[in-house]
From Swiss-Prot:
Keywords: ATP-binding, Cell cycle, Cell division, Cell shape, Cell wall biogenesis/degradation, Cytoplasm, Ligase, Magnesium, Nucleotide-binding, Peptidoglycan synthesis. The lineage of its organism: Bacteria, Pseudomonadati, Pseudomonadota, Gammaproteobacteria, Pasteurellales. It is an enzyme of class 6 (ligase). Its main location: cytoplasm. This is UDP-N-acetylmuramoyl-L-alanyl-D-glutamate--2,6-diaminopimelate ligase. The keyword Transmembrane helix does not apply. The keyword Manganese does not apply. It holds the Pfam family Mur_ligase. The gene is murE. It catalyses: UDP-N-acetyl-alpha-D-muramoyl-L-alanyl-D-glutamate + meso-2,6-diaminopimelate + ATP = UDP-N-acetyl-alpha-D-muramoyl-L-alanyl-gamma-D-glutamyl-meso-2,6-diaminopimelate + ADP + phosphate + H(+).
Length: 494
């Protein structure tokens, strides 16, 4: 329970009201809430003040563009409506006060960049859990303690949601949290008042340009996490051109590189000196300002070497013991359904990935190839009632980057599965070499049966999804379960 005066000092007319929570969406208002009426990107929350009052809001905080109006109060139906100048940019701090500044009560790491945010926050939570923490994540796949994640709508929730989620983590005993910070979230001041222990920058590519107009604006948006917001340590990918520029401006930041010929100019740095890929994952030899050694990673792909090293540098800069980190690294699994490796003795290695666009399929096949001593198999399909144009393009990519291809169904929805497959087959130069098997479980089993033990089978398109949509029916189906079941039955065959 928060008193209004604790938030805003002695606001004239505002009685000492007790408030239960801060709410931005008038539809979610309950008895005892503080309704926050913001002038948003698309919607003006101030239009909904009457609805909020009708639903029992105890007080309203309304944005104003007029500095003279700041903290002036009017009463409507017994409810104080308090004007607040430039409320949007102060909301993180107000929500921080309201929820008792939870970011000060745990170790908080913010991750920004185009790719890798989700994997990095998962790896941070997994690794710190192995080291005895109670760790939480906030981002694309949801918010919550590791293993109890609830789905979320945006990568970075509103300023209020972020503070409320952190307060919830603290209440549940978390002492470590990794949060994905989107560029939208930075521009809209959603993480403004958080005390970050570490900020990580992954990389920058053409993403969300409709919102930010140009690459330069986008880079500036991301950079706010390192310059204007308070973070004790900055970890920056030195293999990215934007990262290199930032490192020149931030002498105290930690430079992280996968390039063996990298010459560090920072006092603190980490680089890979040799990387060996195999079906088991990657062996990474490293040197750093903390010492040198070897990491045995079960993760797949070059990009996951970069992700892992950024996480490793983060934990080293927070003071974790280098030997303990090296000992626990093989237990890290990354994100469910993203280049997820499944294996059994004397069996081919299976990789399940959610790649369902041409670009993602190409990257997944190239990553799988790094780990493949024998032949590379690809099992994929294309969704029905969705972009038809990509079907032949994905065929071309599968043919170019894999040795054997099996085309199967992937959520045909209300389209004819046979028609979808025809659209895909049109993209192959040699369709006679391609197998078609509509039943997805059978397609996966066929690939695993035909592949040798040093082959790799990439099963693309579903990732963490555990359903198949046929017609309008959602049926339970999981690529992982199909593979695990097959391995369980066949593991004893030499």
């Amino acid at each position: 329970m928060r008193r209004l005066t604790a938030l805003l000092g002695q606001v004239e007319l505002a009685p000492n009201i007790e408030l239960t929570e801060m709410i931005l969406d008038s539809r979610a208002v309950k008895q005892g809430c503080l309704f926050v009426a913001l002038q948003g990107h698309q919607v003006d929350g101030r239009q909904y003040i009457p609805q909020a009052i009708a639903k029992g809001a105890s007080a309203v905080l309304a944005e104003t563009e007029d500095a003279q109006q700041h903290l002036s109060t009017k009463i409507e139906q017994g409810v104080p409506i308090i004007s607040f100048y430039q409320l949007g940019s102060h909301l993180s701090a107000l929500a921080g006060l309201f929820y008792d500044n939870p970011s000060h009560k745990l170790t908080l790491v913010g991750v920004t960049g185009t790719n890798g945010k989700t994997t990095i926050s998962q790896l941070l939570a997994q690794w710190t859990t192995l080291l005895g923490h109670r760790s939480a994540v906030m981002g694309t796949i949801g918010n919550g303690l590791l293993g109890q994640v609830k789905e979320a709508t945006n990568t970075t929730g509103s300023a209020v949601e972020v503070q409320a989620s952190l307060a919830d983590f603290v209440k549940r005993g978390a002492d470590f949290a990794a949060i994905e910070v989107s560029s939208h979230g930075l521009v809209q001041h959603r993480v403004e008042a958080l005390a970050f222990d570490v900020a990580i920058f992954t990389n920058l590519s053409r993403d969300h340009l409709d919102y930010h107009q140009s690459m330069e604006n986008y880079a500036l948006a991301k950079k706010r996490l390192f310059t204007e917001l308070n973070s004790r340590h900055q970890i920056i990918n030195a293999d990215d051109s934007v990262g290199q520029t930032w490192l020149q401006e931030q002498p105290n930041a930690v430079a992280v590189s996968c390039q063996t010929d990298f010459k560090p100019h920072q006092a603190r740095w980490l680089k890979a000196t040799a990387i060996q890929f195999s079906q088991k994952g990657a062996r990474i030899q490293f040197e750093s300002s903390w010492g040198k050694g070897e990491l045995h990673s079960a993760l797949i792909g070059q990009f996951n070497v970069s992700n892992l090293l950024l996480v490793f540098a983060t934990l080293l800069s927070l003071g974790y013991d280098i030997e303990k980190l090296m000992k626990t690294v093989p237990q890290l699994t990354g994100v469910c359904g993203r280049m997820e490796r499944l294996s059994a003795s004397n069996q081919p290695t299976a990789i399940v990935d959610y790649a369902h666009t041409p670009d993602a399929l190409e990257k997944a096949l190239q990553a799988a190839r790094l780990h493949c001593q024998g032949k590379l198999w690809c099992v994929f399909g294309c969704g029905g009632d969705r972009d038809r144009g990509k079907r032949p393009i994905m065929a071309k990519i599968a043919e170019q980057f894999a040795d054997h291809v099996i085309v199967t169904d992937d959520n045909p929805r209300t389209e004819s599965a046979a028609q979808i497959v025809q659209d895909i087959l049109a993209g192959f130069e040699h369709p006679q070499h391609v197998e078609v098997c509509h039943a997805r479980d059978q397609a996966i089993i066929q690939a695993l049966q035909k592949a040798d033990s040093d082959d790799v089978v990439l099963i693309a398109g579903k990732g963490h999804e555990d359903y198949q949509i046929i017609g309008t029916q959602k049926q339970h189906f999981s690529d992982q379960e199909t593979v695990q079941q097959y391995f369980k039955v066949n593991h004893h065959h030499a």
